[in-house]
Each structure stands twice: as structure tokens, then as C-alpha cells.
A protein has these predicted regions:
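Extended, low-complexity, charged intrinsically disordered regions
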Residues: 1-6
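C-terminal, charged low-complexity interaction regions
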Residues: 203-307
Length: 307
């Protein structure tokens, strides 16, 4: 099983009709706040007779802080996208597939809006703060810095880049960035991650010296994908699926006709479990197809009642 792909075209289709109008109004507000700060700083510079270097430094700092404060004051704007993003993943976190979001505003900025941990001089991708294509539906554990007894992680302000590390530090920069973190909206990225029978997320790349392996490995760490309760939940699902399939196999071989009602009940239980754990699979394919092409390869199962 791989990380699930989210089609950004589906996000765009669901945007509110007045989305761009709302964003334009927000930027007018933000630009107004930074303009006010600039006027105040320049007035103070005249009063205190600053040189150009001090003026430039103070302006940059004041505008940066005013912009950040103004952007954060409008967090309700990207917060309104939460339900739309959630609908594309059946309420599951786009990174770890958890439904335990426990967050009032589970919208992550893939390119962090306030700062970049790996590049101290980066102001953050503030110009993407209200860009819908930069939004990802994320649980608190994937998006916030956390440490437990066995793992640490949380994306927070991290946005590492593969060498050469050329970040776009303004809206005018045009560097081709190569992010380390896997993006669930990238159809190639989702195949770089898989899950083993112990419930652990791990690279789906054999060559551990390749950049692709590094991307998957660091994504597991920074998204906190092996947070112990989440990993154990995956393992429990694997155990239950294996048990149900094993029981259906045994009853089918013994006497299918005699056991068909029990078999049907077990198949219904299996269907319900997959529907809860992997709803996107059953939303487009019947149970047997989902088992044969996704669940069986993932769990290494043999099934004698399909075909």
C-alpha cells in the first residue's frame, strides 16, 4: 500500500465561487497593514536621524513582523478549506491516513508560510499563505513538532530541499525547487512510500543511497508517520484482515456450500474493515478487486475464494 494520491484538480473544482475575491480582500488588508508600518518606521527614522543601513534593517524587520501578524490574523480563510480538503480523503490526514485529527484547523501549508527551519534567512513562503494549491489536510501529529518515547517528528516549519539547496525566498524567485518531503498531491511521490506488516511506514525504494530513498526516509521522520499509536493501529488492522481472510479460506476449503452463510458474514466484516481503513479503494472498486490488487499484495496473503 502506498501513500494515497490527492488530485489538486479536485480541490480546484470544489473551491467556493467567491474564493479569489475573498483572497484579494485579505491581501488588501495585509498590504494596508505593512504600508502603515512602513510609514511609522520612516517617520521614526527622520525623527531619530537614522542612516540608510539602519532604516533598511528596521523597515525589513517591521514589515516582516507586520505581514506575519496580519497573515496569521486571517487564518480563518484557509481554515474554511478544511471541509473541502477533508472530503477528498474521507476525513483522513493526507500524510498518515489517520482520522484522529484533534485539531481545530487541520490545514497545513506544504511550503511553510512563516519560516523555513533549514534556511534561517528564509522569510517563509508568505505569498503562498492563501494559495489553495499549497494547502494539505493534516493531523496534528504530522504537522506539529512532537517527541514520544520511541519516535520524534512533526513537519512544522521544515521544508528541506535536495542539493543544490536553492529555495525561492520571494515571489519573484524562479528556482526549480526539489523538495525532500513527499507530497500527496504528486502522483510520483506517493509511490515512494509503503507500509510493512508491522504497520511501519517505510521507503518503497531499494537503493538506500538514492535521493528517492532519502526523501521517503526523511518524510517518515518529519511527518511522524511511525508515531507508535498510529503504527500499532495499522498493525491491528493487518492482524484482523489476516484473521478474517484465513477463516474465509479455511471455511471455503472445508465445505463452501455448508459454510456459505458464515463466509458471507466474514466477507461483510472484511468489507466494513476495509471501508473504514481504506475508503477510497472501495469507493471505486468492489471488495474482490480491492483485495486482489491492493490488500493481498500488501499483507502477503493467499486467497482461495477469488477467481
Amino acid at each position: 500500500m502506498n501513500m494515497h494520491f490527492i488530485d489538486k484538480d479536485e480541490v480546484e473544482i470544489r473551491l467556493p465561487d467567491n474564493w479569489q475575491e475573498k483572497v484579494d480582500v485579505v491581501w488588501q488588508y495585509i498590504n494596508g497593514k505593512t504600508a502603515e508600518v512602513e510609514v511609522d518606521v520612516r517617520a521614526k527614522a527622520v525623527e531619530e536621524i537614522w542612516d540608510n543601513d539602519k532604516l533598511e534593517h528596521e523597515l525589513k524587520s517591521a514589515i516582516l513582523n507586520a505581514r506575519k501578524k496580519a497573515i496569521n490574523s486571517k487564518s480563518d480563510v484557509w481554515g474554511t478549506m478544511s471541509q473541502i480538503l477533508s472530503g477528498l480523503s474521507f476525513g483522513k490526514c493526507w500524510y498518515c491516513e489517520s482520522t484522529e485529527l484533534r485539531s481545530d484547523n487541520p490545514v497545513d501549508h506544504f511550503r511553510p508560510k512563516g519560516k523555513v527551519a533549514e534556511c534561517p534567512e528564509h522569510p517563509g513562503y508568505w505569498w503562498l499563505a492563501f494559495e489553495w494549491s499549497n494547502f494539505r489536510y493534516s493531523c496534528t501529529y504530522c504537522n506539529s513538532r512532537r517527541v514520544d518515547t520511541e519516535t520524534s517528528g512533526g513537519k512544522q516549519d521544515h521544508f528541506p530541499i535536495l542539493p543544490p539547496p536553492m529555495w525561492n525566498k520571494s515571489r519573484d524567485d524562479v528556482f526549480i525547487e526539489n523538495p525532500v518531503l513527499l507530497d500527496p498531491t504528486d502522483i510520483d511521490d506517493v509511490n515512494l512510500l509503503t507500509f510493512n506488516i508491522n504497520g511501519e511506514a517505510c521507503p518503497n525504494v531499494d537503493d538506500n543511497s538514492s535521493p528517492l530513498y532519502r526523501r521517503a526516509k526523511e518524510s517518515v521522520e518529519l511527518y511522524h508517520l511511525n508515531h507508535v499509536p498510529t503504527k500499532n493501529a495499522r498493525k491491528r488492522i493487518c492482524q484482523k484482515v489476516r484473521m478474517l481472510v484465513s477463516n474465509i479460506n479455511r471455511l471455503s476449503v472445508q465445505n463452501f456450500e455448508e459454510n456459505k452463510l458464515t463466509i458471507k458474514d466474514l466477507k461483510i466484516q472484511l468489507h466494513k474493515m476495509i471501508r473504514v481503513s481504506c475508503p477510497r479503494l472501495l469507493s471505486i472498486q468492489p471488495l474482490e478487486y480491492t483485495l486482489e490488487n491492493f490488500i493481498i499484495p500488501m499483507f502477503g496473503l493467499k486467497i482461495c475464494w477469488i477467481g
